[in-house]
Amino acid sequence: MATANIELQSAAEHEAHPTNFIRQIIDEDLATGKHHNVYTRFPPEPNGYLHIGHAKSICLNFGIAQDYHGKCNLRFDDTNPVKEDVEYVDSIKQDVEWLGFNWEGEPRYASDYFDQLYGYAVELIEKGLAYVDELSPEEMREYRGTLTEAGKNSPYRERSVAENLALFEKMRNGEFAEGKACLRAKIDMASPFMVMRDPVIYRVKFASHHQTGDKWCIYPMYDFTHCISDAIERITHSLCTLEFQDNRRLYDWVLEHISIERPLPHQYEFSRLNLEGTLTSKRKLLKLVEEGAVDGWDDPRMPTISGLRRRGYTPASLREFCRRIGVTKQDNVVEFSALESCIRDDLNINAPRAMAVINPLKVIIENFETPETLTMPNHPNREEMGTRQVQLTKELYIDQADFREEANKQYKRLVLGKEVRLRNAYIIKAERVEKDAEGNIVCVYCSYDPETLGKNPSDGRKVKGVIQWVSATDCLPAEFRQYSRLFTMPNPGSEEDIIAAINPQSLVVRQGFVERSVANALSEKAYQFEREGYYCADSKDSRPDHLVFNLTVSLKEGF
């Protein structure tokens, strides 16, 4: 397997392999000879785009295989053709590769094993361990019982092996309508575990499949498919989130009762990623997309990997986030600031600096006549990132928030009658203002001190404030998309009307200016716009004649 390229220069990411209970189990399995190698898998269902929660599973499964010199499969659990699509298959492949991982061989599909799965279902019937049930879905729910009341046996439970084989063949041949028959495992309707009360393992669906076309009209259920796929692929450690803990009983039961090569895989559960204020239900995310509440699955406000990527998150920052939160069996909610901290740390090291003015206010330096070309570092601490040339001209733009006619001593920016330093340039003084008919300031007239380029005033006066600027005659117009949380409540998944719960201020669009050095900003190219935040060129809408930058994260937490 290829080794992930680590961009985030964090000492933490270069520590020895992280310790968690799963790695302790693997260490023991290898030490005792239970397994001689490590084989994991990442098995998403292609019914939506991957989200931040999947990133944790990707980093865990591929990371373990990488660290133990093992292998990790990418397998699509494609057992429900109604909800799945090749679009999702392609996006998942892209996301895994973008995160820095390579899977073993070609991608696998559960549908690759449909013939074998059918054969194992027949084997269970022949052993008297599966039967065709014709209860309606409503009747089946009634017969199933509750957590405090045992279920009841279906009247079809004691059919003969021959009858079940014939009926299952009819199911395969399309002789039953959807919902009129299913194949159930014969386990225990009185089990305290609902998953063991004769679960459905095959159902009828007349739907074309993105891999197998119209070959099948019956499809295996996830719980039946997943464990057998693991065994076929010789997976040693099948890693799932905690909601599948009870399903492990069915996982083991299926494998123990079919003729499949030993040793059998074993399932281990870990806590899923619950990120504060973040929605990870694919069904609800799909609703946001379908109702046009967001700009597709890759909207920068979405918690999808493609959305985070478009917003400006890097593979290294997401890997580092997954490393920091760790792997445990305890469910908890991770603060969103923990994710922001990872991308902020990454971009602080790797993003070149540039100047942007998002809420422009015209400045005219009355005693400055001849334009000057100033050389500025692309990064204050990394000489190897080089320098850039920026034009200083008589007319500039500064941010509206950086000027006041009157202010207290805590305001360290430009005030009428006082001085401030232009970033990497001279000290200027606000002399007078021009206002429009409504009393709004439209221009600040200034003077500059020509002896202050790169040095303090010779007379010893103190000028503490520094503000960014761009030349009004040598800058580029740009659109700035300032993103914040899509939802303001800590648990949006609990909201019934998810559309109504959207934060109306989650996207604010501004029209401003950037220095010319970013004219050819490539898709997803990140910058620190000084004193503004970390931004990246939008991968869909930004182009040389219409620059669009997305706010990735603020410069400081809580800013």
Swiss-Prot record:
Localization per record: Cytoplasm
Positions of ATP binding: E45, P46, N47, H51, I52, G53, H54, A55, K56, S57, T241, R272, L273
EC top class, as a word: ligase
Gene Ontology cellular component annotations, sorted alphabetically: cytosol
Annotated catalysed reactions: tRNA(Gln) + L-glutamine + ATP = L-glutaminyl-tRNA(Gln) + AMP + diphosphate
EC number, as in UniProt: 6.1.1.18
Key words, A-Z: Aminoacyl-tRNA synthetase, ATP-binding, Cytoplasm, Ligase, Nucleotide-binding, Protein biosynthesis
Motif position, 'KMSKS' region: 279-283
Binding residues for L-glutamine: D77, Y222
Main subcellular localisation: cytoplasm
SUPFAM superfamilies: Nucleotidylyl transferase, Ribosomal protein L25-like
Segments carrying motif 'HIGH' region: 44-54
Single annotated GO MF: ATP binding
One GO BP: glutaminyl-tRNA aminoacylation
Residues forming coiled coils: none
UniProt-listed HAMAP family: Gln_tRNA_synth (MF_00126)
Assembly mode: Monomer.
Family: Belongs to the class-I aminoacyl-tRNA synthetase family.
Protein's name in the database: Glutamine--tRNA ligase
